[in-house]
Design a protein with these regions (language model features):
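A charged helix-plus-loop insertion that forms the helical arch/lid used to bind
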Residues: 77-88
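Short, intrinsically disordered, charge-biased short linear motifs at domain edges
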Residues: 155-164
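General beta-strand structural signal in soluble alpha/beta enzymes
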Residues: 104-108
Length: 307
Protein backbone atom coordinates (compact mmCIF):
# COMPACT_ATOMS: atom_id res chain seq x y z
CA UNK A 1 0.00 0.00 0.00
CA UNK A 2 1.22 3.54 -0.74
CA UNK A 3 2.25 5.79 2.13
CA UNK A 4 -0.22 8.23 3.64
CA UNK A 5 -1.01 11.09 1.29
CA UNK A 6 0.17 14.37 2.88
CA UNK A 7 -1.79 17.65 2.72
CA UNK A 8 -1.20 19.27 -0.65
CA UNK A 9 -1.27 22.80 -1.98
CA UNK A 10 -3.17 22.43 -5.25
CA UNK A 11 -2.87 25.04 -7.99
CA UNK A 12 -5.00 25.07 -11.15
CA UNK A 13 -4.15 27.43 -13.99
CA UNK A 14 -7.03 27.90 -16.41
CA UNK A 15 -7.88 30.17 -19.27
CA UNK A 16 -10.56 32.01 -17.30
CA UNK A 17 -9.53 31.49 -13.67
CA UNK A 18 -6.58 30.80 -11.39
CA UNK A 19 -7.38 28.66 -8.35
CA UNK A 20 -5.56 27.33 -5.31
CA UNK A 21 -6.60 25.04 -2.47
CA UNK A 22 -5.37 22.99 0.45
CA UNK A 23 -6.41 19.39 -0.10
CA UNK A 24 -6.20 16.70 2.56
CA UNK A 25 -5.21 13.11 1.88
CA UNK A 26 -8.82 12.08 1.31
CA UNK A 27 -9.37 14.63 -1.44
CA UNK A 28 -11.26 17.16 0.70
CA UNK A 29 -10.67 20.87 0.16
CA UNK A 30 -10.03 22.59 3.49
CA UNK A 31 -9.32 26.03 1.99
CA UNK A 32 -9.63 27.45 -1.50
CA UNK A 33 -9.47 30.74 -3.37
CA UNK A 34 -9.68 31.83 -6.98
CA UNK A 35 -9.29 34.92 -9.13
CA UNK A 36 -9.99 35.62 -12.82
CA UNK A 37 -7.11 34.93 -15.17
CA UNK A 38 -5.88 38.31 -16.43
CA UNK A 39 -7.19 38.68 -19.97
CA UNK A 40 -4.10 40.38 -21.29
CA UNK A 41 -0.67 41.39 -20.15
CA UNK A 42 2.88 40.20 -19.89
CA UNK A 43 4.08 36.89 -18.52
CA UNK A 44 5.34 38.44 -15.29
CA UNK A 45 2.05 40.24 -14.62
CA UNK A 46 0.18 36.95 -14.87
CA UNK A 47 2.73 35.29 -12.60
CA UNK A 48 2.34 38.08 -10.04
CA UNK A 49 -1.41 37.42 -9.91
CA UNK A 50 -0.88 33.71 -9.34
CA UNK A 51 1.89 34.27 -6.79
CA UNK A 52 -0.36 36.58 -4.76
CA UNK A 53 -3.12 33.97 -4.80
CA UNK A 54 -0.81 31.21 -3.58
CA UNK A 55 0.70 33.47 -0.92
CA UNK A 56 -2.72 33.65 0.72
CA UNK A 57 -2.83 29.92 1.45
CA UNK A 58 -2.74 28.94 5.13
CA UNK A 59 0.17 26.76 6.31
CA UNK A 60 0.00 22.98 6.45
CA UNK A 61 0.79 21.77 2.94
CA UNK A 62 3.74 19.40 2.54
CA UNK A 63 3.71 19.09 -1.25
CA UNK A 64 2.47 21.19 -4.17
CA UNK A 65 0.73 19.98 -7.32
CA UNK A 66 -0.04 22.10 -10.37
CA UNK A 67 -2.45 21.49 -13.24
CA UNK A 68 -2.32 23.61 -16.38
CA UNK A 69 -3.42 23.36 -19.99
CA UNK A 70 -0.80 22.27 -22.49
CA UNK A 71 1.40 21.94 -24.34
CA UNK A 72 4.12 21.68 -21.71
CA UNK A 73 7.45 20.11 -20.89
CA UNK A 74 6.93 18.42 -17.54
CA UNK A 75 10.56 17.30 -17.27
CA UNK A 76 11.73 20.91 -17.46
CA UNK A 77 8.68 22.33 -15.68
CA UNK A 78 7.80 24.65 -18.58
CA UNK A 79 4.27 25.51 -19.77
CA UNK A 80 3.00 26.99 -23.05
CA UNK A 81 -0.81 26.80 -22.71
CA UNK A 82 -2.60 27.64 -25.96
CA UNK A 83 -5.29 29.46 -23.99
CA UNK A 84 -2.76 31.70 -22.19
CA UNK A 85 -0.66 33.36 -24.93
CA UNK A 86 1.45 35.30 -22.40
CA UNK A 87 3.15 32.10 -21.24
CA UNK A 88 5.41 30.40 -23.73
CA UNK A 89 8.05 28.20 -22.13
CA UNK A 90 7.22 29.71 -18.75
CA UNK A 91 9.00 28.00 -15.80
CA UNK A 92 5.84 27.52 -13.76
CA UNK A 93 6.97 24.53 -11.68
CA UNK A 94 10.19 26.12 -10.50
CA UNK A 95 8.54 29.47 -9.83
CA UNK A 96 5.93 27.83 -7.59
CA UNK A 97 8.52 25.67 -5.84
CA UNK A 98 10.54 28.80 -5.03
CA UNK A 99 7.47 30.75 -3.93
CA UNK A 100 6.09 28.02 -1.66
CA UNK A 101 9.23 26.23 -0.49
CA UNK A 102 7.48 22.94 -1.28
CA UNK A 103 8.45 20.03 -3.54
CA UNK A 104 6.33 20.74 -6.61
CA UNK A 105 5.04 18.62 -9.48
CA UNK A 106 3.34 19.81 -12.67
CA UNK A 107 1.08 18.12 -15.22
CA UNK A 108 -1.56 18.70 -17.85
CA UNK A 109 -4.96 19.61 -16.41
CA UNK A 110 -6.81 16.69 -17.97
CA UNK A 111 -4.15 14.20 -16.89
CA UNK A 112 -4.42 15.66 -13.41
CA UNK A 113 -8.17 15.12 -13.52
CA UNK A 114 -7.59 11.51 -14.60
CA UNK A 115 -5.58 10.94 -11.43
CA UNK A 116 -8.27 12.59 -9.31
CA UNK A 117 -11.05 10.52 -10.88
CA UNK A 118 -9.09 7.33 -10.28
CA UNK A 119 -8.45 8.16 -6.62
CA UNK A 120 -11.79 9.64 -5.60
CA UNK A 121 -14.17 9.98 -8.55
CA UNK A 122 -15.99 8.20 -11.35
CA UNK A 123 -13.10 5.86 -12.17
CA UNK A 124 -12.35 4.43 -8.71
CA UNK A 125 -11.42 0.77 -9.15
CA UNK A 126 -11.05 1.06 -12.94
CA UNK A 127 -7.80 -0.09 -14.47
CA UNK A 128 -8.30 1.73 -17.79
CA UNK A 129 -10.29 4.87 -18.63
CA UNK A 130 -10.27 8.28 -20.28
CA UNK A 131 -10.71 11.58 -18.48
CA UNK A 132 -11.54 14.83 -20.30
CA UNK A 133 -11.85 18.53 -19.60
CA UNK A 134 -14.24 20.42 -21.90
CA UNK A 135 -13.94 24.03 -20.88
CA UNK A 136 -12.10 27.03 -22.34
CA UNK A 137 -10.05 24.36 -24.11
CA UNK A 138 -10.33 20.58 -24.46
CA UNK A 139 -7.85 18.15 -22.92
CA UNK A 140 -7.57 14.47 -22.15
CA UNK A 141 -5.84 12.11 -19.78
CA UNK A 142 -5.64 8.35 -20.27
CA UNK A 143 -5.07 5.60 -17.74
CA UNK A 144 -4.13 2.17 -19.09
CA UNK A 145 -3.81 -0.84 -16.81
CA UNK A 146 -3.55 1.38 -13.74
CA UNK A 147 -0.83 3.62 -15.20
CA UNK A 148 -1.20 7.22 -16.35
CA UNK A 149 -0.26 7.36 -20.03
CA UNK A 150 2.73 9.67 -20.21
CA UNK A 151 5.75 10.59 -22.27
CA UNK A 152 8.93 12.60 -21.88
CA UNK A 153 7.18 15.96 -22.34
CA UNK A 154 3.96 15.18 -20.48
CA UNK A 155 1.67 15.76 -23.46
CA UNK A 156 0.18 12.29 -23.99
CA UNK A 157 -3.60 12.17 -24.28
CA UNK A 158 -4.15 15.46 -26.14
CA UNK A 159 -7.63 14.47 -27.34
CA UNK A 160 -8.43 18.12 -28.06
CA UNK A 161 -6.34 17.83 -31.20
CA UNK A 162 -8.08 14.84 -32.72
CA UNK A 163 -9.63 15.93 -36.02
CA UNK A 164 -13.41 15.66 -35.71
CA UNK A 165 -14.42 17.99 -38.59
CA UNK A 166 -11.97 17.66 -41.51
CA UNK A 167 -11.50 21.08 -43.09
CA UNK A 168 -13.21 22.76 -40.15
CA UNK A 169 -12.23 25.80 -38.11
CA UNK A 170 -8.57 26.66 -37.73
CA UNK A 171 -7.19 25.63 -34.34
CA UNK A 172 -4.65 27.57 -32.31
CA UNK A 173 -2.27 24.68 -32.99
CA UNK A 174 -2.43 25.46 -36.73
CA UNK A 175 -4.52 22.48 -37.90
CA UNK A 176 -8.15 22.61 -39.02
CA UNK A 177 -11.08 20.76 -37.48
CA UNK A 178 -9.53 19.84 -34.12
CA UNK A 179 -11.96 18.99 -31.35
CA UNK A 180 -10.73 22.02 -29.40
CA UNK A 181 -11.35 24.30 -32.41
CA UNK A 182 -14.91 23.01 -32.76
CA UNK A 183 -16.17 22.16 -29.27
CA UNK A 184 -14.32 24.23 -26.67
CA UNK A 185 -15.88 27.16 -24.87
CA UNK A 186 -13.57 29.44 -26.82
CA UNK A 187 -14.78 27.96 -30.11
CA UNK A 188 -18.45 28.22 -29.14
CA UNK A 189 -18.02 31.87 -28.21
CA UNK A 190 -16.22 32.60 -31.48
CA UNK A 191 -18.93 30.97 -33.58
CA UNK A 192 -21.98 32.31 -31.73
CA UNK A 193 -20.64 35.71 -30.74
CA UNK A 194 -21.76 35.13 -27.14
CA UNK A 195 -20.33 33.40 -24.06
CA UNK A 196 -20.40 29.61 -24.29
CA UNK A 197 -22.81 29.48 -21.34
CA UNK A 198 -25.43 31.30 -23.46
CA UNK A 199 -25.38 28.74 -26.29
CA UNK A 200 -28.70 27.28 -27.42
CA UNK A 201 -29.73 23.60 -27.53
CA UNK A 202 -28.44 22.93 -31.05
CA UNK A 203 -24.98 24.23 -30.26
CA UNK A 204 -24.86 22.30 -26.99
CA UNK A 205 -25.89 19.11 -28.75
CA UNK A 206 -23.25 19.60 -31.44
CA UNK A 207 -20.55 20.05 -28.81
CA UNK A 208 -21.66 16.80 -27.18
CA UNK A 209 -21.73 14.97 -30.49
CA UNK A 210 -18.20 16.02 -31.40
CA UNK A 211 -16.85 15.07 -27.99
CA UNK A 212 -18.62 11.72 -28.26
CA UNK A 213 -17.01 11.19 -31.66
CA UNK A 214 -13.56 11.73 -30.20
CA UNK A 215 -14.28 9.48 -27.21
CA UNK A 216 -15.42 6.68 -29.53
CA UNK A 217 -12.18 6.96 -31.51
CA UNK A 218 -10.11 6.62 -28.34
CA UNK A 219 -12.27 3.72 -27.10
CA UNK A 220 -11.77 1.89 -30.39
CA UNK A 221 -8.04 2.56 -30.36
CA UNK A 222 -7.24 1.71 -26.74
CA UNK A 223 -9.99 -0.68 -25.56
CA UNK A 224 -11.46 1.76 -23.02
CA UNK A 225 -14.98 1.46 -21.60
CA UNK A 226 -15.32 4.67 -19.59
CA UNK A 227 -14.84 8.39 -20.21
CA UNK A 228 -15.30 10.79 -17.27
CA UNK A 229 -15.80 14.37 -18.45
CA UNK A 230 -15.45 17.61 -16.49
CA UNK A 231 -15.10 21.28 -17.35
CA UNK A 232 -17.41 24.27 -17.32
CA UNK A 233 -18.82 23.60 -20.79
CA UNK A 234 -19.60 19.90 -20.31
CA UNK A 235 -20.92 20.20 -16.76
CA UNK A 236 -22.72 23.46 -17.52
CA UNK A 237 -24.55 22.00 -20.52
CA UNK A 238 -25.52 18.89 -18.56
CA UNK A 239 -27.80 16.42 -20.30
CA UNK A 240 -27.92 18.63 -23.41
CA UNK A 241 -24.25 17.68 -23.77
CA UNK A 242 -24.08 14.19 -22.27
CA UNK A 243 -27.14 12.82 -24.11
CA UNK A 244 -25.83 13.56 -27.63
CA UNK A 245 -22.32 12.57 -26.56
CA UNK A 246 -23.47 9.12 -25.48
CA UNK A 247 -25.52 8.71 -28.67
CA UNK A 248 -22.44 9.44 -30.77
CA UNK A 249 -20.32 7.04 -28.73
CA UNK A 250 -22.95 4.34 -29.26
CA UNK A 251 -23.01 5.09 -33.01
CA UNK A 252 -19.25 5.10 -33.50
CA UNK A 253 -17.89 2.59 -30.95
CA UNK A 254 -19.26 -0.63 -32.43
CA UNK A 255 -16.46 -3.13 -32.00
CA UNK A 256 -17.08 -5.99 -29.60
CA UNK A 257 -14.62 -4.55 -27.06
CA UNK A 258 -15.72 -0.90 -27.35
CA UNK A 259 -19.49 -1.28 -27.66
CA UNK A 260 -21.08 -0.17 -24.41
CA UNK A 261 -18.47 2.49 -23.65
CA UNK A 262 -19.99 5.05 -21.28
CA UNK A 263 -19.40 8.78 -21.13
CA UNK A 264 -20.26 10.22 -17.71
CA UNK A 265 -19.93 13.45 -15.79
CA UNK A 266 -16.97 13.78 -13.47
CA UNK A 267 -17.85 12.69 -9.95
CA UNK A 268 -15.61 15.43 -8.56
CA UNK A 269 -17.73 18.32 -9.81
CA UNK A 270 -16.33 21.82 -9.67
CA UNK A 271 -13.55 20.68 -7.30
CA UNK A 272 -12.13 18.29 -9.89
CA UNK A 273 -9.28 20.48 -11.19
CA UNK A 274 -7.98 21.16 -7.68
CA UNK A 275 -8.34 17.57 -6.48
CA UNK A 276 -6.54 16.57 -9.66
CA UNK A 277 -3.74 19.04 -9.00
CA UNK A 278 -3.27 17.57 -5.53
CA UNK A 279 -3.20 14.11 -7.08
CA UNK A 280 -0.36 15.25 -9.36
CA UNK A 281 1.72 15.96 -6.25
CA UNK A 282 0.87 12.63 -4.63
CA UNK A 283 1.58 10.76 -7.85
CA UNK A 284 4.91 12.53 -8.21
CA UNK A 285 5.79 11.82 -4.59
CA UNK A 286 4.97 8.13 -5.04
CA UNK A 287 2.12 8.04 -2.52
CA UNK A 288 -0.81 7.53 -4.90
CA UNK A 289 -1.96 4.32 -6.57
CA UNK A 290 -4.91 4.29 -8.95
CA UNK A 291 -5.94 0.70 -8.33
CA UNK A 292 -4.63 -2.43 -6.74
CA UNK A 293 -2.75 -4.75 -9.07
CA UNK A 294 -4.75 -7.74 -10.27
CA UNK A 295 -4.30 -10.83 -8.14
CA UNK A 296 -1.81 -13.36 -9.40
CA UNK A 297 -3.41 -16.52 -10.75
CA UNK A 298 -3.09 -19.51 -8.45
CA UNK A 299 -0.29 -21.90 -9.30
CA UNK A 300 -1.30 -24.82 -11.43
CA UNK A 301 -0.97 -28.04 -9.50
CA UNK A 302 1.10 -30.67 -11.29
CA UNK A 303 -0.84 -33.54 -12.71
CA UNK A 304 -0.55 -36.70 -10.65
CA UNK A 305 1.70 -39.34 -12.17
CA UNK A 306 -0.04 -41.96 -14.23
CA UNK A 307 -0.52 -45.49 -13.00
Amino acid sequence: MPATRPPALAVDVGGTKLAAALVDGEGRLTWQARVPTPGAGEAEALWATLAALVAGAPPGAEVCGVSCAGPMDTAAGLVSPLNIPAWRGFPLRDRLAAATGLPTWLDNDAKALALGEGLFGAAVGRRSYLSMVVSTGVGGGIVLDGRLLDDDGGNAGHIGHLIVEPGGRRCACGAHGCLEAEASGTAVAAVTGAPAAAAGPEVRARVGTLVGRAVASVANLLDLRLAAVAGSVALGYGEEFFGPAQEEVDRCARLAFSAGTRIVASALGADGPLVGAAAVAWWGAGVASLCSPPPSPPPVAPSPPGP
